[in-house]
Amino acid sequence: CAPECRSFCPDQKCLKDCGCI
């Protein structure tokens, strides 16, 4: 996922919209 998404989900799988699984 994109870096800005990782800040939201550091140790979860990120979705394309930066959501978490």
UniProtKB/Swiss-Prot annotation:
The keyword Secreted applies. Signal peptide: none annotated. The keyword Transcription does not apply. Its main location: other. Disulfide bonds join C1-C18, C5-C14, C9-C20. It is found in: Nematocyst; Secreted. Keywords: Disulfide bond, Nematocyst, Secreted. Expressed in tentacles. It comes from the Eukaryota. One of its GO terms (cellular component) is extracellular region. Peptide of unknown function. Does not exhibit antimicrobial activity against Escherichia coli and Staphylococcus aureus. Promotes cell proliferation of human fibroblast skin cells. Does not exhibit any effect on voltage-gated ion channels, including potassium, sodium, and calcium channels. This is Peptide Hact-2.
